[in-house]
Protein backbone atom coordinates (compact mmCIF):
# COMPACT_ATOMS: atom_id res chain seq x y z
CA UNK A 1 0.00 0.00 0.00
CA UNK A 2 2.81 2.39 0.91
CA UNK A 3 4.60 1.59 -2.36
CA UNK A 4 1.48 2.48 -4.37
CA UNK A 5 1.16 5.75 -2.47
CA UNK A 6 4.82 6.55 -3.10
CA UNK A 7 4.45 5.77 -6.81
CA UNK A 8 1.48 8.13 -7.09
CA UNK A 9 3.59 10.85 -5.50
CA UNK A 10 6.49 10.10 -7.84
CA UNK A 11 4.23 10.49 -10.88
CA UNK A 12 3.65 14.09 -9.84
CA UNK A 13 7.37 14.89 -9.72
CA UNK A 14 9.05 14.82 -13.14
CA UNK A 15 12.50 14.65 -11.60
CA UNK A 16 11.77 11.52 -9.58
CA UNK A 17 9.92 9.87 -12.45
CA UNK A 18 12.77 10.64 -14.85
CA UNK A 19 15.35 9.24 -12.45
CA UNK A 20 13.35 6.05 -11.92
CA UNK A 21 13.13 5.53 -15.68
CA UNK A 22 16.85 6.11 -16.15
CA UNK A 23 17.83 3.74 -13.32
CA UNK A 24 15.55 1.06 -14.75
CA UNK A 25 16.80 1.38 -18.34
CA UNK A 26 20.48 1.53 -17.42
CA UNK A 27 20.19 -1.56 -15.25
CA UNK A 28 18.36 -3.36 -18.06
CA UNK A 29 21.24 -2.47 -20.41
CA UNK A 30 23.86 -3.70 -17.95
CA UNK A 31 22.10 -6.99 -17.20
CA UNK A 32 20.87 -7.73 -20.74
CA UNK A 33 24.12 -9.52 -21.51
CA UNK A 34 24.26 -11.66 -18.37
CA UNK A 35 22.48 -14.79 -19.66
CA UNK A 36 24.28 -14.65 -23.01
CA UNK A 37 27.87 -13.70 -22.29
CA UNK A 38 29.24 -17.20 -21.64
CA UNK A 39 27.78 -18.56 -24.85
CA UNK A 40 28.94 -15.51 -26.82
CA UNK A 41 32.48 -15.69 -25.46
CA UNK A 42 32.47 -19.38 -26.34
CA UNK A 43 31.46 -18.52 -29.90
CA UNK A 44 34.29 -16.00 -30.17
CA UNK A 45 36.79 -18.52 -28.76
CA UNK A 46 35.47 -21.33 -30.93
CA UNK A 47 34.66 -23.53 -27.94
CA UNK A 48 32.39 -23.51 -24.89
CA UNK A 49 34.41 -25.06 -22.08
CA UNK A 50 35.81 -24.15 -18.65
CA UNK A 51 38.21 -21.67 -20.22
CA UNK A 52 35.33 -19.87 -21.95
CA UNK A 53 33.35 -19.74 -18.70
CA UNK A 54 36.33 -18.26 -16.86
CA UNK A 55 36.96 -15.73 -19.63
CA UNK A 56 33.29 -14.73 -19.64
CA UNK A 57 33.51 -13.96 -15.93
CA UNK A 58 36.61 -11.84 -16.46
CA UNK A 59 35.04 -9.91 -19.33
CA UNK A 60 31.77 -9.30 -17.47
CA UNK A 61 33.77 -7.86 -14.56
CA UNK A 62 35.78 -5.48 -16.77
CA UNK A 63 33.00 -2.89 -16.89
CA UNK A 64 33.03 -2.83 -13.09
CA UNK A 65 36.81 -2.48 -12.92
CA UNK A 66 36.84 0.41 -15.38
CA UNK A 67 33.91 1.93 -13.51
CA UNK A 68 35.99 2.13 -10.33
CA UNK A 69 38.53 4.19 -12.25
CA UNK A 70 36.10 6.46 -14.09
CA UNK A 71 33.30 7.19 -11.59
CA UNK A 72 35.13 10.00 -9.72
CA UNK A 73 35.97 11.70 -13.03
CA UNK A 74 32.36 11.70 -14.19
CA UNK A 75 31.18 12.89 -10.78
CA UNK A 76 33.48 15.90 -11.02
CA UNK A 77 32.34 16.60 -14.58
CA UNK A 78 28.74 16.56 -13.47
CA UNK A 79 29.39 18.97 -10.63
CA UNK A 80 31.22 21.32 -12.98
CA UNK A 81 29.06 21.20 -16.12
CA UNK A 82 25.69 20.00 -14.86
CA UNK A 83 24.48 16.53 -13.98
CA UNK A 84 21.85 16.19 -16.70
CA UNK A 85 24.19 17.45 -19.41
CA UNK A 86 26.94 15.09 -18.31
CA UNK A 87 24.46 12.22 -18.15
CA UNK A 88 23.59 12.87 -21.81
CA UNK A 89 27.26 12.62 -22.82
CA UNK A 90 27.77 9.48 -20.73
CA UNK A 91 24.83 7.55 -22.14
CA UNK A 92 25.60 8.66 -25.69
CA UNK A 93 29.22 7.56 -25.33
CA UNK A 94 28.27 4.25 -23.72
CA UNK A 95 25.68 3.60 -26.41
CA UNK A 96 28.06 4.29 -29.29
CA UNK A 97 30.82 2.18 -27.74
CA UNK A 98 28.35 -0.65 -27.21
CA UNK A 99 27.45 -0.64 -30.92
CA UNK A 100 31.08 -1.47 -31.72
CA UNK A 101 30.51 -4.88 -30.15
CA UNK A 102 28.74 -5.80 -33.38
CA UNK A 103 32.11 -5.64 -35.16
CA UNK A 104 34.22 -7.60 -32.67
CA UNK A 105 35.78 -10.72 -34.16
CA UNK A 106 37.66 -12.15 -31.19
CA UNK A 107 37.39 -12.30 -27.43
CA UNK A 108 40.10 -9.70 -26.84
CA UNK A 109 38.35 -7.07 -28.94
CA UNK A 110 35.16 -7.84 -27.04
CA UNK A 111 37.00 -7.41 -23.74
CA UNK A 112 38.40 -4.02 -24.80
CA UNK A 113 34.96 -2.78 -25.83
CA UNK A 114 33.49 -3.94 -22.51
CA UNK A 115 36.21 -2.09 -20.61
CA UNK A 116 35.60 1.16 -22.52
CA UNK A 117 31.84 0.69 -22.12
CA UNK A 118 32.38 0.59 -18.36
CA UNK A 119 34.43 3.80 -18.45
CA UNK A 120 31.40 5.65 -19.76
CA UNK A 121 28.62 3.89 -17.91
CA UNK A 122 30.32 4.39 -14.54
CA UNK A 123 29.23 8.03 -14.50
CA UNK A 124 25.54 7.41 -15.10
CA UNK A 125 24.48 6.48 -11.57
CA UNK A 126 26.42 9.23 -9.70
CA UNK A 127 25.07 11.94 -11.99
CA UNK A 128 21.43 10.91 -11.90
CA UNK A 129 21.66 10.44 -8.13
CA UNK A 130 23.12 13.93 -7.76
CA UNK A 131 20.41 15.34 -10.02
CA UNK A 132 17.77 13.59 -7.93
CA UNK A 133 19.13 15.22 -4.78
CA UNK A 134 18.87 18.61 -6.48
CA UNK A 135 15.29 18.26 -7.71
CA UNK A 136 13.65 16.76 -4.62
CA UNK A 137 12.69 18.43 -1.36
CA UNK A 138 14.50 17.24 1.75
CA UNK A 139 11.19 16.04 3.17
CA UNK A 140 10.80 13.37 0.46
CA UNK A 141 14.44 12.72 -0.43
CA UNK A 142 14.66 9.40 1.42
CA UNK A 143 11.45 8.22 -0.19
CA UNK A 144 12.73 9.30 -3.61
CA UNK A 145 15.97 7.35 -3.24
CA UNK A 146 13.98 4.32 -2.12
CA UNK A 147 11.82 4.51 -5.25
CA UNK A 148 14.76 4.80 -7.63
CA UNK A 149 16.44 1.85 -5.91
CA UNK A 150 13.26 -0.16 -6.51
CA UNK A 151 13.39 0.90 -10.16
CA UNK A 152 17.02 -0.21 -10.37
CA UNK A 153 16.20 -3.59 -8.83
CA UNK A 154 13.36 -3.98 -11.33
CA UNK A 155 15.81 -3.39 -14.18
CA UNK A 156 18.09 -5.97 -12.59
CA UNK A 157 15.58 -8.77 -13.08
CA UNK A 158 13.99 -7.51 -16.31
CA UNK A 159 17.38 -7.25 -18.05
CA UNK A 160 18.37 -10.94 -17.86
CA UNK A 161 14.81 -12.07 -18.66
CA UNK A 162 14.72 -9.81 -21.71
CA UNK A 163 18.22 -10.84 -22.77
CA UNK A 164 17.34 -14.52 -22.52
CA UNK A 165 14.08 -14.05 -24.43
CA UNK A 166 15.74 -12.05 -27.20
CA UNK A 167 18.54 -14.61 -27.36
CA UNK A 168 16.00 -17.21 -28.49
CA UNK A 169 14.95 -15.22 -31.55
CA UNK A 170 17.96 -13.04 -32.41
CA UNK A 171 21.70 -13.65 -32.85
CA UNK A 172 23.59 -12.83 -29.66
CA UNK A 173 25.48 -10.06 -31.43
CA UNK A 174 22.23 -8.24 -32.21
CA UNK A 175 20.94 -8.67 -28.66
CA UNK A 176 24.11 -7.07 -27.32
CA UNK A 177 23.79 -3.95 -29.47
CA UNK A 178 20.19 -3.53 -28.33
CA UNK A 179 21.70 -2.11 -25.14
CA UNK A 180 23.60 0.47 -27.19
CA UNK A 181 20.45 1.50 -29.03
CA UNK A 182 18.57 1.89 -25.73
CA UNK A 183 21.36 4.04 -24.26
CA UNK A 184 21.48 6.32 -27.31
CA UNK A 185 17.72 6.67 -27.01
CA UNK A 186 18.07 7.56 -23.32
CA UNK A 187 20.64 10.23 -24.20
CA UNK A 188 18.41 11.74 -26.89
CA UNK A 189 15.35 11.69 -24.63
CA UNK A 190 17.26 13.39 -21.82
CA UNK A 191 18.76 16.02 -24.12
CA UNK A 192 15.51 17.01 -25.81
CA UNK A 193 13.28 16.94 -22.73
CA UNK A 194 15.84 18.47 -20.33
CA UNK A 195 14.02 16.95 -17.37
CA UNK A 196 15.21 18.43 -14.10
CA UNK A 197 12.34 18.48 -11.63
CA UNK A 198 8.75 19.47 -11.19
Please report, for each region that a protein language model flagged, where it lies by residue.
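Juxtamembrane intracellular "pre-TM" segments in multi-pass secondary transporters
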Residues: 1-20
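Short amphipathic helix-loop junctions that connect adjacent transmembrane helices
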Residues: 35-54
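Residue-level signature of mid-helix packing/kink "hotspots" within the transmembrane helices
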Residues: 64-72, 156-157
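Helix-to-loop junctions at the C-terminal end of transmembrane segments
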Residues: 69-82, 167
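Structural signature of the two symmetry-related core transmembrane helices
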Residues: 85-100, 180
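Paired small-residue
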Residues: 97, 108-116
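Intracellular juxtamembrane helix-capping segments at the cytosolic ends
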Residues: 123-136
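A membrane-interface helix-boundary motif in multi-pass transporters
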Residues: 165-183
